[in-house]
């Protein structure tokens, strides 16, 4: 058999199965021969597993496109999922059938539940494709199903939009038969309906079909507010407009009414046509009855719009077609009271201006701001229009609402005064021009003021030549020279000074008493200042008593300060009416560079009338930049730090309290290194402690009497104590502070501390020895019962052995209670005397501290521990001084407390040592947390203790474990011990349960289970978590705590030590040579370093060797870059000067030659705004208000 013969039975089986299925499906009464085949899964699997070869997708889609239904069916039944297959364009079989008008394929796809709303890559459905391909039968079939007619493609077009845009008239007619399934008012892109598209593309037939067959309404606007008739007018769609007119006439609406429809902005179609700039559309609107005098919402007519656009052809057309409306339009004004002539003048359209004036427009009409077309053209730099209007006889004396004439606007906008003057002289009179020269506006400024302000050199020169007065003052009493000085117009100033009256105006003052020299100095225009000084400007003061150098210092212009000082050095220390020097004013304005320059010049550090220095203002307003410039000055820093402060005894304490970062810079400056290699033996590090010592301490002065309120006695370690008070960890951890404490420690601290520790250790030893001897030298004395004397006379060991053998005798002894007494040996008496002497001496010291510290002493827990220790120790040693040596339970309790607290206080002593002290600090911090937590959760201990007392106190045959629940106090203690894990579950609960002695076993076990969950598990883990968290916080604050303890230690010592002796051991500076071989350590230092680790290890303190290596490198690199920038700037200035000389030599005229150097008014306003708003992060509005108030301080404050 051949391979074909082998496959024959398989094909027959497949064919018979298929015939059976087809027959069964056809026999169903509700299904036809074309009904979809709902094949069972096993038959579908048989079909897929048959040897039928796989057919490409292209063949399947080509079958749909060709309309061959048999092939399409065969391919579909081979794989039902092929109905959703798409080609490269995203088109399905339904798209292909619709494109080729294959209704049979579409009908079969519908029978197979195909998707007719599927989109291709362009977003088109089969309905879009049918419209685009003129497949009318397919279109009719799809609409009859019906399919979704509102699907939008990528261009936001529904099928009806697409048919209208492509002018598919026949397709629209087919769609009109199914208008009930089509939303004709559906919006596409920008909300445009199909009627909008017909108007835009002028498809009149489409528009007619949409109106007649679809009942489309032309009164439906798009999202932009335009009606279809506006779109037709804008796009000159005359045929479509005619359709709209006919529709309106059929409904009783005239053409004039149709052409007068307003859009959202109040535009009629004629406005839209003018906006579009198409003269045909305008002509169409005019022929349709549109009025050129129709106003939109802003009251502008189409003539206004055409004049603003410069469309003279449209203007002429409108006037020619509607001559009766011309006069009305020429005088019609918009919301700004502007006529069409204003619009044409504003946008510099001289041809339209000439035409409008020829047609009778009012050449001197005024708008809302009283501007004529001439003023409006001049304000918008329309110089062609300006000259034309002058030639046409426009009035040049008209002023606007701000009283500015045309000459003001010519100067302000950079017009050529020579051309303007020539036009006025030729067309009008020279006298009229003379009147304009010195006229003032509402601010009192003449054209010469504006020429000086804006730096128009040529205009200024022409104004002076024409006879303008150079000493006119505005409302602020400012002359043109003041304006030129304020804006840095060097050449303008020179021209004004070279004029006839130049020598008379150089020293004139404005309303604030400021001369041009004051103003130029305040604005930092160094060249202008130099020019004024060379021309003989006098050094007057303004109304606040300030000289030019003070104003330059306030603004921070260092070059101006140096120039003024080089000419008039006596200005440096002059004061204003409030007693402020230039340094005060520069500090108030936070100008660090000016402060550095002034201090380098040698300015005096004086106080103003409020008795405040410059550093006081920097501290008061919290200006770190200003303070840093003063306290880190190379030469004058010591003088600044020596000044007294208004609120603090000295500047150092004020900086620590208010500006720690600034004082950190002071500390950095106090550490200097030798100028040699760091590995050299001669390399040293010098620490200066002058600012930490605070040698300049001043008393507070009573303002009324002038006497000292407090004595100016030296305060121990004032700087370090202030750091501790304000929590300045970074300052305490600074190498200078640590080295300062190390100097104190090495000078006297370690000796006194070790001596104190040694004395306390002796007391501790005697307390321990006494307690041991007391317990070993107790004797028993019989009471009144003489029968028990034989037992009482025995020693403790013999008595214990006898009592263990005779329990009845032991109970009798307990009942009769023998008296106990101590054997007063010499050792016990000696120890008791030493203890008493120590306690008496320390009690006197504690009483002195109570007198000094008062309430603060009581709040210290350590002091309470000390008093309890002293009292318990005295009670403990009392039997040693009694004749009979009697001892009772009180003495036992006192002895136990004294021994415990004495050793506990030794632990507190160790917290001042660095290596072990940190652990003591952590222990105490966690102890505080534990006490707080236990105070809160003691509620649970009481709750469970009472519950266990009720459940376990009444056991019939109690075991020893149940005795702990016999009363409430014992039950609470037992509950607390159970919290630590001592449950004894078997003995307390299990044995009792199996002996049936638990009264309520279920309740007992329930409460026990709750207890085990809440107390040993939950509460103990909570305590551990809190402890870990507190350890982290303690580790973060350990540095401050350790250093604070050292500060407190040295402060207490210095309060008690003689001042003369302290002056002898203190050092103002310390020099270390880190590379030299260290000498042999002393015994004390060796012990401390070995066991306690000296609080100031050499390794940590030596880190300062390289603490500013990077800073030095960065500073050097920055200085090098600054020098390069200065050189580049200098070279650019030289090249700019040479280029100007070349241009002048070659007589090249440019617009730049007409503008003087300096800054523009807008730039000056922005700079002033930044200064007023705070140019840096330290100038908040609140601080700026305070600063302004400070400038006018008086003594009454």
UniProtKB/Swiss-Prot annotation:
One of its GO terms (molecular function) is calcium channel activity. The gene is TrpA1. Residues 1-753, 849-856, 911-932, 1026-1197 are cytoplasmic. Its main location: membrane. Glycans are attached at residues 785, 802, 823. Disruption phenotype: Eliminates avoidance of elevated temperatures along a thermal gradient. GO terms for cellular component: cation channel complex; membrane; plasma membrane. The chain crosses the membrane at residues 754-774, 828-848, 857-877, 890-910, 933-953, 1005-1025. This is Transient receptor potential cation channel subfamily A member 1. Belongs to the transient receptor (TC 1.A.4) family. One of its GO terms (biological process) is cellular response to heat. Keywords: ANK repeat, Cell membrane, Glycoprotein, Ion channel, Ion transport, Membrane, Repeat, Sensory transduction, Transmembrane, Transmembrane helix, Transport. Residues 775-827, 878-889, 954-968, 990-1004 are extracellular. It holds the Pfam family Ank_4. Essential for thermotaxis by sensing environmental temperature. Receptor-activated non-selective cation channel involved in detection of sensations such as temperature. Involved in heat nociception by being activated by warm temperature of about 24-29 degrees Celsius. The keyword Transmembrane helix applies. It is found in: Cell membrane. The keyword tRNA processing does not apply. Residues 969-989 dip into the membrane without crossing it. Homotetramer. SUPFAM superfamilies: Ankyrin repeat. It comes from Drosophila melanogaster.
